[in-house]
Amino acid sequence: MKLSELLSTYSIETEFSNDFEVHALAELDKATPNDISYIDQARYLKLLKDSKAGAVFIRKKESSKVPKRMQALIVDNPHLAFAKASHAFKIPFFKNPESVSEPKHFKKVTIMPNVMIGEGVEIGENSLIYPGVVIADGVKIGKNCVLYPRVILYQNTILEDNVTIHAGSVIGGDGFGYAHTALGEHVKIEHVGIVRIQKNVEIGANTAIDRAVFGETLIKEGVKIDNLVQIGHNCVLGEHSIVVSQVGLSGSTTTGRNVVFGGQVGIGGHLHVGEFTQIGGKSAVGKDLPPNTNFAGAIPAMEIHEWHHFLAHLRTNFRKQQKTSLLQKAKGFFKS
């Protein structure tokens, strides 16, 4: 699609000089000369210097930072312009839904009844697909994988060897991403990335792992994920990490290896948790966490020894307050 057609179709008002063929939307550091990117925060301006993007949505006040080789597409709201443009690159679940039927052409794979498989799907030997599984176009499944009933794999999801996914889990659905108009209306960002799950991963029942805006949501080798977990777009879970039930990871959370998330932990987006760190149940994480540390606490999570001191201090003060209250009541009683 030509740049002029893209801007016209999605009502994006800006000026341009070179009407090039646009292939995709991409991150600044991964873009090619036929890609468009955007900058919505000043901290990303430093990426312009080495970016190969053909054009970038950007505010006028920051447009002087754009290299001459790249077109500055000046708009009031770069995030909104990007959201509108993303609709041109939406990838269908089934490109030809009328032609989808129960599969018959996979060798050395056990596929039970009522499984729906799209076009261009690859499934490795000795994999087992239970009833009710739905596999969208372009999915790649390695050897010795097990998909339990009603698992759904969205388009272009990749499972490496020895992956087990339990019933009802959804891998590769759209992330929760929206831009906002001046009136507060929400404009959906079409997520055109994928989910990649490396080998020897096990995922519990009714867990959701969202596809990336672009690039990959990545679950690395040996990760174990419990039931009822939500993993947002563009997250990266390090090797052999453990995620216990009802954890919620906001978009672009990344971790080192062997991180442990206790039950019901919530973590804000664009944060990093260092390797071998453990986070106690119900903790709320709002900042980067260093490696080789234990954290606990509701709001916010803190180093576990601090949390224990905090609880002790809270308990001591509460007891003192109770004693003071009782003494005051006793004094009042005897005065009367």
Curated annotation (Swiss-Prot):
Pathway: Bacterial outer membrane biogenesis; LPS lipid A biosynthesis. Disulfide bonds: none annotated. Keywords: Acyltransferase, Lipid A biosynthesis, Lipid biosynthesis, Lipid metabolism, Repeat, Transferase. Its EC number is 2.3.1.191. GO terms for biological process: lipid A biosynthetic process. GO terms for cellular component: membrane. GO terms for molecular function: N-acyltransferase activity. It comes from the Bacteria. The keyword Chloroplast does not apply. The keyword Repeat applies. It catalyses: a UDP-3-O-[(3R)-3-hydroxyacyl]-alpha-D-glucosamine + a (3R)-hydroxyacyl-[ACP] = a UDP-2-N,3-O-bis[(3R)-3-hydroxyacyl]-alpha-D-glucosamine + holo-[ACP] + H(+). The active site is at H233. Homotrimer. Catalyzes the N-acylation of UDP-3-O-acylglucosamine using 3-hydroxyacyl-ACP as the acyl donor. Is involved in the biosynthesis of lipid A, a phosphorylated glycolipid that anchors the lipopolysaccharide to the outer membrane of the cell. PANTHER family: UDP-3-O-ACYLGLUCOSAMINE N-ACYLTRANSFERASE, UDP-3-O-ACYLGLUCOSAMINE N-ACYLTRANSFERASE 1, MITOCHONDRIAL-RELATED. Belongs to the transferase hexapeptide repeat family. LpxD subfamily. HAMAP family: LpxD. This is UDP-3-O-acylglucosamine N-acyltransferase. The lineage of its organism: Bacteria, Pseudomonadati, Campylobacterota, Epsilonproteobacteria, Campylobacterales.
